[in-house]
Amino acid sequence: MNVNVINHPLVRHKLTLMREADCSTYKFRTLATELARLMAYEASRDFEIEKYLIDGWCGQIEGDRIKGKTLTVVPILRAGLGMLDGVLDLIPTAKISVVGLQRDEETLKPVSYFEKFVDSMDERPALIIDPMLATGGSMVATIDLLKAKGCKNIKALVLVAAPEGVKAVNDAHPDVTIYTAALDSHLNENGYIIPGLGDAGDKIFGTR
C-alpha cells in the first residue's frame, strides 16, 4: 500500500489527545492544526530543490529554493478546513484550491457541489487535506477532479485512515501517496473509523 504512517512521538501524543472522548472543540481544533503542521513537514520532504544565487552579507552565494510552481493545498469541505492553517503555517505561499462533495442519493457516490482550483494545476504539486480517510470515496473523487485538471503530483494528508479507505485510494490511484498519523483497525457498520476520532467535522466546527 502506498501509505506513509508518520510515527513521530509528537504526532502520536497529539493524536491520542484528540481521541479523548471529552476533547473540547477548542482543543480538538488546536490539535488538528498542530498535527497538520507536523505532518506537512513530512509530506514536503521530497520537494524538488534548485540552486540559485543570492547576495549575502559577505558577497554572492549559492542557495536553495523549492523548484517549480507553488504547492496548492486542497481542503475537502468542510472538515479539511480544520487542517488548512497548520499547512499554511509551514508553507505560507501555498495556493488554496477547494473541493466540496455530497452523496448522490441514487448512486450513493460522492459528487462535486463546489470546486475552485487555482491556475496552472498541471504544473503544481497538490496536497489534499481531510482529517479522516474512511471509505475513501471522497478522496478518490477529489483526486479524479485534480487529475481532470491535469495535476500529476498529488499527495493526501489525513489524520486517521482506515484500511478500507487506503485500499480504495490505492486501487483507483496507485500513484498517490497517503500520509497519515495512524492506520486504524476498521470501519464499523455506520462507516466510522474504529477507534478513529468520531465526527471530526462536528468536533472542529463545534456542531456536535
UniProtKB/Swiss-Prot annotation:
Tell me the keywords, alphabetical order: Allosteric enzyme, Glycosyltransferase, GTP-binding, Magnesium, Nucleotide-binding, Transferase
How, per the record, is the cofactor bound?
Binds 1 Mg(2+) ion per subunit. The magnesium is bound as Mg-PRPP.
InterPro entries listed in its UniProt record: PRibTrfase_dom, PRTase-like, Upp_B, UPRTase/APRTase, Ura_phspho_trans
The biological process GO terms on file are: UMP salvage; uracil salvage
Q: Which domain of life is it from?
A: Bacteria
Residues the record lists as binding 5-phospho-alpha-D-ribose 1-diphosphate: 78, 103, 130-138, 199
Q: In which pathway does it act?
A: Pyrimidine metabolism; UMP biosynthesis via salvage pathway; UMP from uracil: step 1/1
Activity regulation info: Allosterically activated by GTP.
- Per UniProt, uracil binds at 193, 198-200
- Catalysed conversion reaction: UMP + diphosphate = 5-phospho-alpha-D-ribose 1-diphosphate + uracil
- EC annotation from Swiss-Prot or TrEMBL: 2.4.2.9
Which CDD domains is this protein grouped with? PRTases_typeI
Q: Which GO terms describe its molecular function?
A: GTP binding; magnesium ion binding; uracil phosphoribosyltransferase activity
* Necessary cofactors: Mg(2+)
Function field: Catalyzes the conversion of uracil and 5-phospho-alpha-D-ribose 1-diphosphate (PRPP) to UMP and diphosphate.
Recorded hits in PANTHER family, A to Z, give:
ADENINE PHOSPHORIBOSYLTRANSFERASE (PTHR32315), URACIL PHOSPHORIBOSYLTRANSFERASE, CHLOROPLASTIC (PTHR32315:SF4)
HAMAP family, per the entry: Upp_B (MF_01218_B)
> Which family does the entry's similarity section mention?
Belongs to the UPRTase family.
- What's this protein's name? Uracil phosphoribosyltransferase
